[in-house]
Amino acid sequence: MCLLQLPVVLLLLSAALNTLKATPIASDTDHRVDKRKCNTATCATQRLTNFLVRSSHNLGAALPPTKVGSNTYGRRNAEVVDVELLHYLPL
């Protein structure tokens, strides 16, 4: 008799859980910082690189791209720029 009641109890429990609504968490109490979606060209380039690496798995080893920040692309070496500017300054 106990084995026959188990499916009935599970069915009722499932129906009760399906009718419950989740309560939203108040954003005032949440102190975590949400990650913002980046819309700059650098981030778009990184997302495109990730997509191409994952989609071209049949061409060779699918190595994940290195994670570089937005300051890496087009970054200049400050020492070289300063030295070049010093040659043009009149003394």
Curated annotation (Swiss-Prot):
A biological process from GO: amylin receptor signaling pathway
* Propeptide positions: 23-34, 77-91
Write the gene name. Answer: IAPP
Keywords for the protein's UniProt record, in alphabetical order: Amidation, Amyloid, Cleavage on pair of basic residues, Disulfide bond, Hormone, Secreted, Signal
Q: Which GO terms describe its cellular component?
A: extracellular space; neuronal cell body
Q: Which PROSITE patterns did the record assign?
A: CALCITONIN
| Gene3D superfamilies, A to Z | 6.10.250.2190
Point out residues bearing the modification Tyrosine amide.
Y73
Q: List the disulfide bonds.
A: C38-C43
Q: What is this protein called?
A: Islet amyloid polypeptide
Q: How does it assemble?
A: Can form homodimers. Interacts with IDE and INS. Interaction with INS inhibits homodimerization and fibril formation.
Q: Which residues form the signal peptide?
A: 1-22
In terms of one coarse class, where is the protein primarily found? secreted
- Lineage, top-rank taxon, reads Eukaryota
